[in-house]
């Protein structure tokens, strides 16, 4: 997917990028590849792959959660790495107020330089672990309209890490690959216990070659407060996931 194909694919979904926004994506790509030479940010570096598997993939969240396109939401991206999905969303929808959490300070420094270079305002960077960022007593707990995660961790783990940051009436948007049904079955009990309720899954395909890749965007509404004991201390959610609770 080259930049013009990226622009057209979004337009097909009603998202029209300006020339200035396209220039921001081009600069994002340039800085990502430059920095990646000395800091391991991504295994994907070819322009067509970055535009498809990072930029376009990040923006598919707006297909599943249309409020992103029109409302001035407070968005928290947990474990954003090189800024995905939150910074492509911020470029496309500048009214968003974005908080990015990552445990590696080098990535936070890259994101700070990137936001400065792109002229992005309303982006806040927090160097912290997901387990402690929205723990009981944290000023960030249950503060955000939408929490996103595009991580490889299982949904049952992501739910414990992300739902505590979402405000009641807000939501958690999980970007998952294929075969999400089994993950959902395992995670539903934990999601309910954490104050969440699965609202639905949007299935789509990325136009990759030789075969299209399946994506699933899971929207979990925050319907009740998360019990104070969650999330558990660092490392525990992944080692002892809340299965059969």
Curated annotation (Swiss-Prot):
GO terms for cellular component: cytosol. Keywords: Cytoplasm, Methyltransferase, rRNA processing, S-adenosyl-L-methionine, Transferase. One of its GO terms (molecular function) is rRNA (guanine-N7-)-methyltransferase activity. It is found in: Cytoplasm. Its main location: cytoplasm. The keyword S-adenosyl-L-methionine applies. S-adenosyl-L-methionine binds at residues 79, 84, 130-131, 150. The keyword rRNA processing applies. InterPro entries: rRNA_ssu_MeTfrase_G (IPR003682), SAM-dependent_MTases_sf (IPR029063). Its EC number is 2.1.1.-. Specifically methylates the N7 position of a guanine in 16S rRNA. Belongs to the methyltransferase superfamily. RNA methyltransferase RsmG family. This is Ribosomal RNA small subunit methyltransferase G. It comes from Limosilactobacillus fermentum (strain NBRC 3956 / LMG 18251) (Lactobacillus fermentum).
């Amino acid at each position: 997917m080259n930049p013009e194909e990226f622009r057209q694919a979004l337009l097909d979904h009603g998202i029209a990028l300006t020339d200035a926004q396209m220039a921001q994506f081009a600069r994002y790509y340039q800085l990502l590849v430059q920095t990646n030479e000395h800091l391991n940010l991504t295994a994907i570096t070819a322009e067509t792959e970055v535009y498809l598997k990072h930029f376009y993939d990040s923006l598919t969240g707006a297909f599943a959660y249309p409020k992103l396109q029109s409302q001035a939401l407070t968005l928290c991206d947990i474990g954003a790495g090189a800024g995905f999905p939150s910074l492509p969303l911020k470029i496309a929808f500048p009214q968003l107020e974005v908080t990015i959490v990552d445990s590696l300070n080098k990535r936070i420094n890259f994101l700070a330089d990137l936001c400065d270079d792109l002229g992005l305002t309303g982006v806040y960077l927090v160097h912290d672990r997901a387990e402690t960022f929205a723990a009981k007593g944290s000023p960030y707990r249950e503060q955000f309209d939408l929490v996103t995660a595009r991580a490889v961790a299982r949904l049952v783990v992501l739910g414990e890490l992300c739902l505590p940051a979402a405000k009641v009436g807000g939501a958690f948007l999980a970007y998952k690959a294929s075969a999400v049904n089994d993950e959902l079955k395992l995670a539903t009990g934990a999601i309910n216990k954490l104050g969440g309720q699965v609202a639905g899954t949007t299935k789509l395909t990325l136009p990759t070659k030789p075969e299209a890749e399946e994506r699933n965007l899971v929207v979990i509404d925050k319907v009740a407060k998360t019990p104070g004991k969650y999330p558990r201390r660092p490392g525990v959610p992944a080692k002892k996931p809340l299965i059969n609770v």
